[in-house]
Amino acid sequence: MKSAEIREAFLRFFEEQGHTRVASSSLIPGNDPTLLFTNAGMNQFKDCFLGQEKRAYTRAVSSQKCVRAGGKHNDLENVGYTARHHTFFEMLGNFSFGDYFKRDAITFAWTFLTSDKWLNLPKEKLWVTVYATDDEAYDIWTKEVGVPAERMVRIGDNKGAPYASDNFWTMGDTGPCGPCTEIFYDHGADIWGGPPGSPEEDGDRYIEIWNNVFMQFNRTADGVLHPLPAPSVDTGMGLERISAVLQHVHSNYEIDLFQSLLDAAAKAIGCTNDAQASLKVVADHIRSCGFLIADGVLPSNEGRGYVLRRIIRRACRHGNKLGAKGSFFYQIVAALVAEMGEAFPELKSQQAHIERVLKAEEEQFAKTLEQGLKILEQDLAELKGSVVPGDVVFKLYDTYGFPMDLTGDIARERNLTLDEEGFEREMEAQRVRARSASSFGMDYNSLVKVDVATEFTGYHATSGSAKVVALYKEGQSVDMLSEGEEGVVVLDQTPFYAESGGQIGDCGYLQAGNARFDVRDTTKTGGAFLHHGVLAKGSLTVGAPVETQVDAQVRHATSLNHSATHLLHAALRQVLGEHVQQKGSLVDSQRLRFDFSHFEAIKPEQIKALEDIVNAEIRKNTPVETEETDIDTAKKKGAMALFGEKYGDSVRVLSMGGDFSVELCGGIHANRTGDIGLLKITSEGGVASGVRRIEAVTGAAALAYLNAAEEQLKEAATLVKGSRDNLIDKLSAVLERNRLLEKQLEQLQAKAASAAGDDLSAQAADVKGVKVLAARLDGQDGKALLALVDQLKNKLGRAVILLGSVHEEKVVLVAGVTKDLTGQLKAGDLMKQAAAAVGGKGGGRPDMAQGGGVDAAALDAALALTVPFVEQGI
């Protein structure tokens, strides 16, 4: 059976047993901040097992995509060198949430594995383990299923503590837990290894293929196990492992799924498919990289993005080792889509995006890979001992982009280890330097501790009546604020929007009789809205009634920019792809700023497309609609949620243009898209690896921006004595004239240099049979000096030349050595000395070198180094 057929058979079997087929969840866990990546089938059902979520079904079956690289579960360094380690794998699983338990779970597993209708595995090849004290499971296996006692193994606490066992599963120190039973396949006596629980169990003969976890206890902090009222079942069977069994091969890399990827990798690299470890690395890594990118991860220097970058660069290095020339990794994506795109449609829909991301990352790493490998080879050649120093590992990481595990891979091939502690010391020193170079403002919310909650009334109002429930000055609770004092006012209700979701807090004022408190900003801590500002007049006490007034003009302008941000987000996903995710935003009354995930600069034509799409939606003048609903209903409607954001039971869904933009948002918005008027993008750039930023203006600010641009065009036209209509032609003519003048200037400089060369050649001194010339030619640039040195080398014959100049307040140096002398004297060595003398750096080839510095006063002394340099070298 092919891997795809096995997957479908598993899902279909359990559907026939009353299970609901559930699609694989994203590799980015949406409900578990403790996980870097989804690494088991049960991850998406965690809240069901904990009793915190009720679903419409109590039986489920899935084929879950999983990644184990980085974090606690990290298989990266073993991938390619063993038969079964992968960064990406599929976990087939069936689950019961308080429905069936041990008897049915065991029977289902045995039937699927051994029935001639399904996998038809020989029963005598299967071994079973149970937890040592789980007599119930043991009896079901032996008395009901019929597994003979000689193929049953009880596994006790083999990890040094109570319930610390390969056959006892825990979610943590406390919480749901229970025994498990595992099914092993015997690959035959020709492979070394013993049954589970034996001294030889680490061999490859007996391989675990299915694990059934029985969650029947809740462990409390005192270590006591209490029976759960509704026991559950969590099972997992690796698709790759069971495919190897059914296809009669021992290594996962020999199954049909991997053979197509290995062939594609070999073709892309230009090598033969001969099962080399490096080829296996590439074939494995294309799966994890392809799926991670499809799920929205982009290469970066932190978190999930850095794990992806490590995997990509490890694949690139192994391809390089096999002789790959240029970018190759992205070329394997098509084979991945052909193999797995049917089961996982996200691969098909995002194939082009995955290829672009991989190619861009390959090209970026290629700039430093070869140079970094040379540096590492030099360091290893000079190494005394078997440990690569931490500072070397750090240099490769910091300067050449080598993740530590990539350097570790290379070291491992030489039977060397890394000084990981030394590397961590270097990393910490860098972090300390970064912290000391940064300054952080104080979070004034952290100073204010408020137990009250404020009712927000600002969605439909900018003014109202309220009561002061708390006052703070310098973070301390006070009963009164006096005129001129800065402080924080907390009200029982307010129309002031508190800073959230990138939208700035409202400003305005509070009026209490003759007292007036000017609100400069509004923030939120817990359920309390904090009005920050200064008491401009009178005094204000706790309990006082106040009239609230938001600055409606600022609020209105801010709301337009916020709505425009939503339209821009939707347009970005249309133009660039659905991988675009919001990474941050700032919305105020003057402009909007939007940070989003993307791997390359946006092209001018894409900027235009974004503006066209957004402005088309603005011109449609559709209503901006809001709806309060639960999170599941919102997601079913296609509402985009910010990843990592925590949402309550009730969420606010904001829609524009029907389904053009549907997002969860609690901010203040326009009434209709037409209110925005116009959007104009003013800048686009990168702010971090894999994160781009767009800044834009709307409405009156956009009109002002365009008017200013119009004035600049008029001014430019005046400068070239033209008009707006013929400005391009006039500018082209000016640039062409400038080009001709520069060419004439170069010709004149060349003539002058030639004349100077004739004069300078007569100044050359003879040092041990070598013509030595050091001269100062202020005002000449580096290009002119290079031409002159070439000319002098031809005229002087056997010669060493150093020319210097002060040009535009900087020192320029050029050194030349005729080729008959480069075995003894090198221009680069002379340049290093001379450049250092003027406070700079330099280098180059043995026959020609360039450099410079900042200390013009030291130029003569630098030139004087030439004769001693020759005397010492000859």
Swiss-Prot record:
- Cite the InterPro entries for this sequence: aa-tRNA-synth_II/BPL/LPL, Ala-tRNA-lgiase_IIc, Ala-tRNA-ligase_IIc_anticod-bd, Ala-tRNA-synth_IIc_core, Ala-tRNA-synth_IIc_N, Ala-tRNA_ligase, Ala_tRNA_ligase_euk/bac, DHHA1_dom
| Cofactor requirements of the protein | Zn(2+)
Which Gene3D superfamilies has this protein been placed in? 2.40.30.130, 3.10.310.40, 3.30.54.20, 6.10.250.550, Bira Bifunctional Protein, Domain 2 (3.30.930.10), Threonyl-trna Synthetase, Chain A, domain 2 (3.30.980.10)
Q: What does the note under cofactor report?
A: Binds 1 zinc ion per subunit.
> Which UniProt key words apply to this protein?
Aminoacyl-tRNA synthetase, ATP-binding, Cytoplasm, Ligase, Metal-binding, Nucleotide-binding, Protein biosynthesis, RNA-binding, tRNA-binding, Zinc
Per the record, the domain of life is Bacteria
**Quick one: a GO cellular component term?**
cytosol
SUPFAM superfamilies, per the entry: Class II aaRS and biotin synthetases, Putative anticodon-binding domain of alanyl-tRNA synthetase (AlaRS), ThrRS/AlaRS common domain, Translation proteins
Tell me a GO biological process for this protein.
negative regulation of DNA-templated transcription
- Subcellular location(s) per record: Cytoplasm
Q: Note the Pfam families from the entry.
A: DHHA1, tRNA-synt_2c, tRNA_SAD
Q: List the Gene Ontology MF annotations in alphabetical order.
A: alanine-tRNA ligase activity; aminoacyl-tRNA deacylase activity; ATP binding; tRNA binding; zinc ion binding
Q: Does the keyword S-adenosyl-L-methionine apply?
A: no
The record's HAMAP family line, in alphabetical order, gives: Ala_tRNA_synth_B
Domain description? Consists of three domains; the N-terminal catalytic domain, the editing domain and the C-terminal C-Ala domain. The editing domain removes incorrectly charged amino acids, while the C-Ala domain, along with tRNA(Ala), serves as a bridge to cooperatively bring together the editing and aminoacylation centers thus stimulating deacylation of misacylated tRNAs.
Task: Tell me the function of this protein.
Answer: Catalyzes the attachment of alanine to tRNA(Ala) in a two-step reaction: alanine is first activated by ATP to form Ala-AMP and then transferred to the acceptor end of tRNA(Ala). Also edits incorrectly charged Ser-tRNA(Ala) and Gly-tRNA(Ala) via its editing domain.
List the PANTHER family hit by this protein, alphabetically.
Answer: ALANINE--TRNA LIGASE, CYTOPLASMIC (PTHR11777:SF9), ALANYL-TRNA SYNTHETASE (PTHR11777)
User: What family does the Swiss-Prot or TrEMBL record give for this protein?
Assistant: Belongs to the class-II aminoacyl-tRNA synthetase family.
According to UniProt, the name of this protein is Alanine--tRNA ligase
Q: Supply the gene name.
A: alaS
